[in-house]
Amino acid sequence: MRHGYYADTYPMKYRVYRISAAFFLAIALPLFFSNAQKGNSVEEEIIQNETIQMEEIPEIKSEYDGTLLAAETGLYQVKEGMLWPLWTKGSVSRIVKGKSWFFLTSEGVIKSDDLINFEDISEGLPHLTIKRYKDGVKSFENQAAALKDLKMHPQNPDVLVTMTRDEVFITRDGGKKWWSLGFCARTNGAKSIAVANMKDSDGVERLTVFISHPLYGLSYIQPDRKNASWIDITAGFEKLPTMSDPDEIADIVPVCYVDETGNTTTEVYLSQSYIPNIYKLDWDAKKAIKIGEKNAGSNGVGGNSGVELDTIDSLFVDGNTLYFVCRNGFSSFNLGTRQFDGAPEEAELWETLSRLSGRRALCLYIPKGVTKFSKPVTLNEMWLFDMEKPQTQYADVAMDKRGLYIPAGQNNPGSQLQGFIDTAKANGLNTVVVDMKDDYGLLRYKTDNEKVLQKATISSYAIDIEKFIKQCKENGIYLVARIVVFKDRNLWRYDGNKYAIVDYATGEPWRGIRSYDYETDEDGNVLSKTATNYYDENWVDPYCEEVWEYNIDIAKDLVAKGFDEIQFDYIRFPTDGLNLDRVKYRWRDTGMDKESALISFLSYARSNIDAPIGIDIYGQNGWYRSGTRTGQDVELLSPYVDVICPMFYPSHFEQYFLAQTPAVERPYRIYYYGCYRNTVIARNKVIVRPWVQAFYLAVSYDKTYYDKDYVKREIFGVRDAIDRGYMYWNNSGKYDYISPDPGDAEYPY
């Protein structure tokens, strides 16, 4: 992996309290939202806080009545000065109002006519099979597949569209039945969707569904056409320098305008996720027209040149103004003057409402009349309001960790270990990452844990873990235990290859073939081929619950001994081998796929490890909203971990990637943009702590540019984007090219 190239009702008894505005904002609602984590009943929490002098503070005004707030723990409403939980069976991320209410939730699509009775209308939408494993017994849950968005036709409230990461669905009867429209690409990943009637060049209005793909821009389909298929629209959208495809589109909103004669015209507005631009779609020309650019005039180098990383999402049009959610707040754009007007008058109220949750509000619905607008306001992606701190329970523990990797065999307690500790301290670092189960599955520490020892092989170079931990703690070092999970030669061989993935053609344990020798006849026709070279990787089955249990037992053992954090590497499926199409996963249960396997494993890990959990991922999976090839879908995995460590190694990307003039700035750009993109994809649920390339690889860019400044530029890129820590990687343990952490120093180049 290190050198692989990337080409019901409220479930408790409660009283309803008439509450003051201040009490509502500061105490009551956060308690509802945090109740599931803390374990106390809402009634108990409110009673404990009733000492507040509520009579001195005016009650919530009736003008706020009807406001809906969606959160991780459900749906809530302000009514008659009281706080009401409406639906608390899961998280809610979208609120859509037509003739009925529709909600995008973790349980699928939910419908309500009265906000009292709620109906699951997800029949026909896909589900994931999630495996649960406890005390040696496995069970299964049929969990709704993650739905990315939910939109309603602006003229027909019976027509709605939604999508998973690789399939689009439409209903024409208010959710009674969903039809698949397929998908716009072979590569999975999706962000936004929309539906409207669009007038074609022949004068006919046709039902049109739009979708944004993280790699390929905008696509549309007109499902009522004969032999309908997805068509891309790429012209006009901004691309990152050196890239051929548009950067990700964050939101799509069709707006219907009626002229004096009663004719309706539909305009489509769009924004981008990582480049803060606003577009209007020229439907006739099938191209985007850029009408707003927050970073106009920048040269694209990065933060040192004045480029501000920002996101424009959750578009809402009223009159001649487009409102949107952006990093740490709201803003607006005048469609007439094509100027950014800044925060609207209502921003303070919206922001106050957005921060009601003890963790976060995901979505907000404000009825017409509460604000000056001519229609209700719905705001999504409200996690953007609070980008200062990641929303993980271990944020205070795992934030601001800067460290280096100590290779196995070089971390013996005493002078050898002290050398790395001294290097760390001299460079402003406070963390070390060490192999505790290495790339071959060998334990690199001595343990007497009988459960672990049943399957483990302890390396002859295993360290005295107690002495190691003691020495690190005496030096104030934060300890991260790296555990290589599914690439494990020891477990691959165990008990007659019980846990190995197999070659379905031969029935033998599978290994990735790197090359063949071919036998040919005199005309060059291939008669036979023989595998002559294999990848140095032995993969166990990621679907296997006994493999999960073994790795989690090791993690629990290490936490008990004193490690601060567990870091899982090779938390993925194999990606290399000319025979990759012959892999068979014997432990795969019916209905499971790669994503459900990794979710199941990490859910099992989360429920058993009382410490921060980190995962290493390919740089490409941190850059794009897609889990293609590896199953490492950041959106799906981020709820189960605290730290994501993307490997944004410049040497591992295509060598032209972001190498525009001045090419020397490429390492800065990759980490600057990459850290922000990964954080946005994860919706700020995790700490993004990247691996930083502190090694030379004989590729064209490194041959020209690799030096101490190359590594320093990477660190400045991390700092200027989302400054939450980093880790140096050098497989040989040679850190001659690292520099002291820059702190607040000016960018020197």
Model-found features: residue ranges?
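Conserved Ser/Thr-centered positions that define the repeating blades of beta-propeller domains
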Residues: V78, K111-S112, T171-R172, I221-P223, ...
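Aromatic-lined carbohydrate-binding/catalytic grooves of carbohydrate-active enzymes
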Residues: I421, K425-A462, T575, D581
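Short coil-to-beta transitions that initiate beta-strands within beta-rich domains
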Residues: E45-E63, W84-G98, S122-Q155, G182-K199, ...
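Catalytic domains of carbohydrate-active enzymes, especially glycoside hydrolases
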Residues: L417-G441, K561-E565, V643, A721-R724
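Substrate-binding cleft of secreted/luminal carbohydrate-active enzymes
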Residues: L384, V641-Q655, V664-Y672, R677, ...
